[in-house]
Amino acid sequence: MTDAKMKKKRTTPFLYLASIVFLPWWISLFFKKSLESWVTNWLNISQSEPFLNDIQEKSLIEKFIELEELLLLDEMIKECPKLDLQKFRIGIHKETIQLMNMYNDDRIHTILHFSTNIISFVILSVCSILGNEELVILNSWIKEFLYNLSDTLKAFCLLALTDFLFGFHTISAWELLIGSVVHNDQMRSLLVCLFPSVLHTIYYFWTFNYLNCVSPSLVVLYDSLVDVD
């Protein structure tokens, strides 16, 4: 009975870790599929006119003007003796509907992403509150693992993590990650420039604070590895 309890005590933190990693993703994916049809119907029924912010409205007007010019140019290239205004208006109307549908789909995806992010945050918060004992066990295991590493290996792991998160080759990964949450081009470009830099500064501050607490010699070793890199 004692062995069974000890085995259960060892496996419970791993099950808890797997649940906080995969459970929010599974549930948010389920809610996203369930909410998609409801959000689409709500937007189509409750909103008689599309709601656009200033940036979206400006972008839509620019695309509409560009579309109008392209259709007019297409009619001129055909060398028609007389421009068919009725056909031209029909073409403009069809393309305008497509543009509005595109912006409507963008709004739907924005609402779904925001909703699923809130759901994931709530699930993680509940798991953190209910699994306080498992968190303590995991924290003790991580501290013991880090304590048993040599100073050189600790510095190497920190340097590898720094390069993995903030290296010059990670720009595309940050663009993909931020683009999956933020769909506005201007906001995405701003966050791609600012977010990694701010996170990098916080990470460096935490790293040197941690190294000073663990072993001051690690700071010198880490600095030397950074200079070599």
From Swiss-Prot:
Any one of the GO CC terms: chloroplast inner membrane
InterPro entries (alphabetical): CemA
Coiled-coil segments on the chain, per record: none
GO terms for MF: antiporter activity; proton transmembrane transporter activity
Keywords recorded for this protein, A-Z: Antiport, Chloroplast, Hydrogen ion transport, Ion transport, Membrane, Plastid, Plastid inner membrane, Potassium, Potassium transport, Transmembrane, Transmembrane helix, Transport
Catalytic reactions of this protein: K(+)(in) + H(+)(out) = K(+)(out) + H(+)(in)
GO biological process: potassium ion transport
Subcellular location: Plastid, Chloroplast inner membrane
Organism superkingdom: Eukaryota
Membrane topology classification: Multi-pass membrane protein
Transmembrane residue ranges: 11-31, 118-138, 158-178, 190-210
Protein family membership: Belongs to the CemA family.
Function noted in UniProt: Contributes to K(+)/H(+) antiport activity by supporting proton efflux to control proton extrusion and homeostasis in chloroplasts in a light-dependent manner to modulate photosynthesis. Prevents excessive induction of non-photochemical quenching (NPQ) under continuous-light conditions. Indirectly promotes efficient inorganic carbon uptake into chloroplasts.
Protein name listed in UniProt: Potassium/proton antiporter CemA
